A protein has these predicted regions:
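Short, small-residue-biased leader/transition segments that mark boundaries at the very start
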Residues: 2-6
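Conserved PLP-binding catalytic core of the aspartate aminotransferase-like
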Residues: 79-80, 84-121
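Short acidic/glycine-enriched loop/turn segments that link adjacent beta-strands
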Residues: 27, 101-102, 132-134
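Short beta-strand-to-loop capping motifs
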Residues: 35, 107-110, 142-144
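PLP-dependent enzyme catalytic core of the Aspartate aminotransferase-like
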Residues: 119-120, 129-158
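Glycine-enriched alpha-helix->loop->beta-strand junction motifs that scaffold or abut catalytic
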Residues: 10-13, 121-122
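PLP-dependent aminotransferase class I/II
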Residues: 12-91, 95-96
């Protein structure tokens, strides 16, 4: 619904979505584009390869869409709950955490945190190469409760 509103208000905006993250399909190249501008849609279609989606990706996409409303609702509720908990825990540790609508948490921590996490078997995104950001800016994804607790426990020990 939100995407439809954006399309109506901004006809030259193209919204691109992938199944990869929300449906946990790493490596499966499947997604879609929403575009109100007919001329732009025609140009985009002209650039597509004749067989641009594999049979495997098509089957995975169809399977993902079965009961997807219930799945998406559960997923959003889980992410909201875990993100709230993690944000609170990180703030208690003195980390500067920014709010977002995404399934990840953006925060400012000590320089070198990425390397320390890697040595401990944890993966966080070093955002220091993003334009306008400096060393010490990181991003973490909301994962399983066990993985989230492991990350918080690790941060507490630093």
């Amino acid at each position: 619904q939100r995407q439809m509103c954006i399309r109506d208000r901004y006809p030259n905006v193209v919204i691109i979505k992938a199944f990869t993250k929300i449906f946990c399909m790493p490596g499966v190249r499947l997604g879609y584009a929403l575009c109100e501008n007919a001329a732009l849609r025609k140009r985009m279609r002209a650039m597509l390869q004749p067989w641009n989606v594999s049979v495997t990706a098509q089957e995975a996409g169809v399977a993902a869409l079965v009961d997807c409303e219930a799945y998406l609702k559960r997923t959003r509720e889980y992410i909201k709950k875990e993100k709230f908990w993690m944000t609170e825990q990180m703030r208690k540790l003195g980390l500067n955490v920014w709010g977002s609508e995404a399934n990840y948490i953006f925060f400012k921590g000590k320089a070198g945190l990425y390397e320390k996490a890697l040595k401990s078997g944890l993966l966080i995104r070093d955002c220091s190469n993003y334009e306008g950001l400096t060393e010490g800016h990181y991003r973490i994804a909301i994962r399983s409760e066990e993985e989230n607790e492991r990350l918080i426990t690790w941060l507490e020990k630093l």
